Amino acid sequence: KGRSFLSNSGSLLRVRPFRFLFHIRIYVMFKLIRQSVLSTLCLAVLLCAAYPMLVTGAADAFFPKEAAGSLILRDGAIVGSALIGQPFSSAKYFHPRPSAAGYNAGSSSGSNYGPTSKALAERVRASEQELRAERPEGVLPVDMLTASGSGLDPHISPDAALMQVRRVAEARGLPPEAVEKLVRGHVEGPEWGVWGEPKVNVLRLNLALDELR
């Protein structure tokens, strides 16, 4: 009693060859199943509990605002996130870049148009006609003609914001110089001073615009 099947050599000698192979296969199969179950349980605990708790705890400790979603408050109420763009269509506000998802965070996506798509060409052409009302001549900002891959881009280029200064100033009855100064004050540099290009957060800019007198 207590001896394994493999160590019981006396019994094995009395078993027919095919029965011996059958028992060997059963033993190996259960051994592999046991290893697989233990590996699955260990990885589940590690990846589904320990790692998420570690990352969440570190984020809350070192980046509490970002971990909470980079939420923007106005009078104690949440008005949006600095990471998620919002649609603005009024002439009194700066407009974001086109979005194939309508800035719906629940259906984040791009247009999936190919470079030879006629629908893409028509959409870009329509955007160009609208933008020419603000910049009749010269090069238009490419970010105002193309949609982002996520459809939720919260930023536009400084050039795209400056192009809209005249319209916003006229709609609000403000001096263009004051609006332009506001835009330049909201230009964010590259991440960590290295990655990306200068940009303007549209939601932050429009909130500051409401406070401009």
PLM ranges: what are they?
Residues 167-213:
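Extracytoplasmic/periplasmic C-terminal soluble domains
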Residues 5-8, 12, 28:
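Intrinsically disordered and other compositionally biased segments
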